[in-house]
Amino acid sequence: MADVTTVADDEAQIRALIQAWADAVRTKDVNAVMRHYASDVVVFDVMPPLFVQGAEPYRCNWQDWFDALEGPADFQFVDLHLAVSGDLAYCFSVNRLRARYRDGTKHDAQTRATVCWRKIDGRWLVVHEHASVPMPVPESIAA
């Protein structure tokens, strides 16, 4: 018999996965972070390079960033929206991240994120992630 779930079930599963991902970021657990990504994920991150294709290269980005931090990260969703339809889902959010780098520099930033999920072999996995920060513009064009 096929696994039949309701949209509410899928939404609850994804919300639990999102929370587990955030907990893994807070504790800098790269293995737990990477459990959420499809092997062929495409990521547009706020840090170079312009994009990353594949979970293994993205793992390196996470590990390098975690290694640069002193202590845990304070990560919070300021606003999170989720929609599910069939085997696809997306969420978007504004996120707040506070951390301290090993050189003593403090990091306190808000980012915008869009994450696309696909149910693959019964598991919800991230297939695309896009994070961005507002870009400063000259005052003459800022409305």
Kindly label every feature range from the protein language model.
Residues A2-R35, V42-A143:
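A beta-strand edge to alpha-helix "cap/lid" segment located at domain peripheries
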